[in-house]
A protein has these predicted regions:
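Gly/Pro-rich turn-and-neighbor structural signature
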Residues: 49, 56, 66-67, 93-216
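Feature activates predominantly on carbohydrate-active enzymes
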Residues: 1-99, 117, 174-175, 188-191, ...
């Protein structure tokens, strides 16, 4: 996972490696993918801060990752590989709000899935607010759970429709980070084939480990 790239990879690439782009793109990601293979790794969640160009805004990035046989994923707040931090344009798309703009949110996610379907990915099922905040929702925890449940099932159906495989054959992951863990504990139901990624609290302490039931997933 390339994180906090603002002060490292972004500035180095912008000033030294991809000056003509003024950001990092396929040339930089080719070096990242090569490094992964040298480290015997094959999975990458790309940089996602709004300072850097979103990975999937540059179609050639996907081709580069595929050439190196690197599977692409995304962070806990990027549903279906869509970088909400820099790709969601409020002036054109409205509010990032699943209660009041469900059609708009689902529309951009559906487009992204279709773009990425020919490549190998692990798709993040998620619904958080912009910039690592909670999604606008009711104060009632049951209502929050119902909203997230609806959103995740809609995302799963998009994957099934675009990729043309049963849901259980499409790699998917869910990270109950911050407020999402409380919603998960409210009784959120996830298909058994969805990988749960347990996060820490940003200070190195795990928030949760799998229960005996979850270990059977």
């Amino acid at each position: 996972f390339i994180n906090d790239e603002d002060w490292g990879l972004y500035r180095w690439s912008k000033r030294n490696f991809e000056k003509e782009r003024g950001n990092f793109g396929p040339r930089t990601y080719a070096k990242v993918c090569e490094l992964l293979l040298r480290l015997q790794a094959n999975y990458l969640c790309p940089a996602m801060h709004d300072a850097s160009m979103a990975f999937h805004r540059i179609p050639e990035n996907r081709v580069v990752a595929d050439r190196f046989a690197i599977l692409m994923g995304a962070s806990h707040c990027e549903p279906l590989l869509f970088n909400t931090a820099s790709e969601w344009k409020r002036d054109k798309m409205g509010e990032w709000d699943y209660i009041n703009n469900k059609k708009g949110v689902d529309s951009v996610l559906n487009v992204r899935v279709k773009e990425c379907a020919p490549f190998e990915n692990v798709y993040t099922l998620a619904l958080r607010g912009l910039h690592d905040r909670a999604m606008n929702a009711s104060n009632d925890m049951g209502d929050r759970k119902d909203m997230l449940q609806e959103a995740l099932m809609a995302q799963r159906q998009m994957l099934i429709d675009a990729i043309g495989k049963p849901g259980e054959e499409i790699p998917q992951a869910f990270t109950p980070y911050k407020e999402v863990l409380d919603v998960y504990d409210e009784g959120l139901e996830l298909p058994d084939d969805v990988t749960i990624i347990w996060p820490d609290d940003n200070y190195g302490y795990m928030k949760r480990l799998s229960s005996p039931k979850e270990q059977k997933r």
